Amino acid sequence: MTLAQFGGLFVVYLIGTLFVLTLTYQEFRRVRFNFNVFFSLLYLLTFYFGFPLTCLLVFQFDVEVVPVEFLLYAILSATAFYAIYYVSYKTRLRKRSVQPRKAVFSMNRVETHLTWILLALVAIVTVGIFFLQNGFLLFKLNSYSQIFSSDVSGVALKRFFYFFIPAMLVVYFLKQDLRAWFFFLAATVAFGILTYVIVGGTRANIIIAFSLFLFIGIVRGWISLWMLVAAGVFGIVGMFWLALKRYSLDVSGPEAFYTFLYLTRDTFSPWENLALLLQNYDKIDFQGLAPIVRDFYVFIPSWLWPGRPDTVLNTANYFTWEVLDNHSGLAISPTLIGSLVVMGGALFIPVGAVLVGMIIKWFDWLYEMGKSESNRYKAAILQGFCFGAVFNIIVLAREGVDSFVSRVVFFCLIFGVCLLMAKLLYWLFDTAGLIKARVQRSRTLTPPASSVRADGLL
């Protein structure tokens, strides 16, 4: 990359960044937080944050990168995608209804507590089983790629670990005070560190827990935008340190700075992967919707499907194995736009942008319903579900549509099963006569009738 090429690329990058950043900031000032703001920040991080890091690697360390023309295509496609997404998100297909909707379900105190307990048990039990089978992998494996080898058993259990976070979210939304906020941080980060050590370097739970803590603080007004930026810098440094431990790296001086640049870029902003995919566009045999179906294979136990393929050819694996001919053991993320290109080429980019706009709009609709819900227990469940889906939106932006669809369906299924089990347990307790009236104490000798609620569990 020459300085002239860098100058032209920088102008295009600056226009795209300012475009996305301006729309995001306007939305932030209007609502402080919704899922459009979250997705937009995540989108900026994924497709724009890595450009300065790439330039530093090129000019400071003479690192070879994708040809400039494909870097340009990556920036242009990212900006065009966001423009279409934003129009899709803001377009209202029907008039706003002024009549209240009929409630689909209701929640009481016991059902809500049973729900978060079941969600937490799903995570804790699966972590325990994984530990009994493998021990502390962080101290046993020589390289991170060994996590995906046949030597590690029960890999599918890792998908259940995340449910500890929505469980703690429900606990927080029942109280919504500073004490509950810090309890959420302490509990989820501690659990994330535990899974980091057991699984052998997986940082997802720590990143998500810290991110949710910050966004809850933004929503409640407990932290400012500048505090969020400072916390983001702290988070980047923390993730770099964890990455050094995960890959057993011991670096110092210029090598440490070089390692920081490429690890931070690959962790938070794999935008060069999109440029690399576009460079190999002629090698792609468009997969259609098959990667979405294939990504569900990992959720099917081998005892239920004896002939299940050992390898899943989703868009990430197709990009890694078929396009790049890379068989190192790690899948290279194609990003959201890259997954659309693998499935249907450039024509799938605007179609995907429209669909993503509708998906984010649905999450915002559900989130607003939770905020306006008068039943505090139902509100906690709805908001816990929405914030719990943050991981799936991260997967959408970073890994692609196919991974998002399979994970969001899995998340909804497990969350729904726990909710139904909680209602079933409540019905059984009530039938057995274990549910008694919960009488709230009052300073007066005769408490008012409203202080009696039939939702206590002895």
Swiss-Prot record:
Classification via InterPro entries: WzyE
Family note: Belongs to the WzyE family.
Record's bilayer topology term: Multi-pass membrane protein
Origin superkingdom: Bacteria
NCBIfam families from the UniProt entry: PRK02975.1
Pathway per the UniProt entry: Bacterial outer membrane biogenesis; enterobacterial common antigen biosynthesis
Keywords in alphabetical order: Cell inner membrane, Cell membrane, Membrane, Transmembrane, Transmembrane helix
Protein name: Probable ECA polymerase
A GO biological-process term: enterobacterial common antigen biosynthetic process
Membrane-spanning segments: 3-23, 37-57, 65-85, 112-132, 154-174, 180-200, 201-221, 222-242, 340-360, 377-397, 409-429
Main localisation: membrane
Function per UniProt: Probably involved in the polymerization of enterobacterial common antigen (ECA) trisaccharide repeat units.
Subcellular location: Cell inner membrane
GO cellular component, one term: plasma membrane
Subunit architecture: Probably part of a complex composed of WzxE, WzyE and WzzE.
Gene: wzyE
Keyword Membrane set for record: yes
